[in-house]
Amino acid sequence: MSIPFSNTHYRIPQGFGNLLEGLTREILREQPDNIPAFAAAYFENLLEKREKTNFDPAEWGAKIDDRFYNNHAFKVPSGATESKEAPPEKSEPEKETPQEVVKEQETQVSFVEEVSTDDEEAAAAAVKIQAAFRGHKARKEVKIMKESSIEEQ
């Protein structure tokens, strides 16, 4: 609701947008005939899940939005990860054995090696870019030559 010629903006509570996005997504997915009844059932189901798992998706979404808009990545060391911001279903176990750590380091190294094998693709892309620029430059020169020949006549 807005008031004409007013600088007043109402603030949406944190997490409310995430709740509405989730409801909208489910409505579009299910295409129900009675949307208000579907919304009531959706929110009841969401409340039951929140009571059982002690996980509030609205609160989690608000934290994610806050992190997106107030990026504090430069304050956190590069190797540190925060498990508080991951949903409980997808969070990793807290205890890791040294073997798992070694496997993670091996996968990171192999990923870096994969990136370096794309040199041929990068060279092909560079050739395409250079050819496009040369064509553009040639068309520009032809246009200038045509304009100068028209002016001379």
From Swiss-Prot:
Primary subcellular site in the record, as a coarse category: membrane
Keyword Membrane in record: yes
Sequence intervals crossing the membrane: none
Signal peptide bounds: none
Tissue expression pattern: Testis- and sperm-specific.
Bilayer topology term: Peripheral membrane protein
Keyword Transport: no
Entry GO terms, CC: membrane
Keywords assigned: Membrane
Domain IQ: from-to ranges: 122-151
GO function terms (MF aspect): calmodulin binding
PROSITE patterns (alphabetical): IQ
Subunit comment: Homodimer. May interact with ROPN1.
Function: Sperm surface zona pellucida binding protein. Helps to bind spermatozoa to the zona pellucida with high affinity. Might function in binding zona pellucida and carbohydrates.
Protein name: Sperm surface protein Sp17
Organism: Notamacropus eugenii
